[in-house]
């Protein structure tokens, strides 16, 4: 995870986030995930699986809607550095995830990322004024 502690104007300042980012033009979501992991952690994803999607209406700084594809990387090559331009990179034990400063809503779907159910989850988590309003999901 990245502890977003490097940029004072960061919307995520002080919080822990999974690695990822925005897609480039003409880039599919799997290629975008591999590129973001390579850019942010200097590792190559050898195996990953789509665990779910989340729609975040109203989440952006100006109330923009965000949509995320959540992947679990199960095999990689390389050694991540201690930090990147966004902050410190940390390996976090699963049982410690809920103790970290996270976005309020992340606590609702993190367990779905690591559970034994092979089906992907698809959730919607509206935000208003920087706060989660609700959380609903289904599995397919």
Predicted regions and their residues:
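N-terminal strand-loop-strand
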Residues: 1-17, 45, 49, 64
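Unchanged
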Residues: 23-46, 57-112, 135-140
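Charged phosphate-binding loop/patch that engages nucleotide di/tri-phosphates or the phosphate backbone
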Residues: 115-140
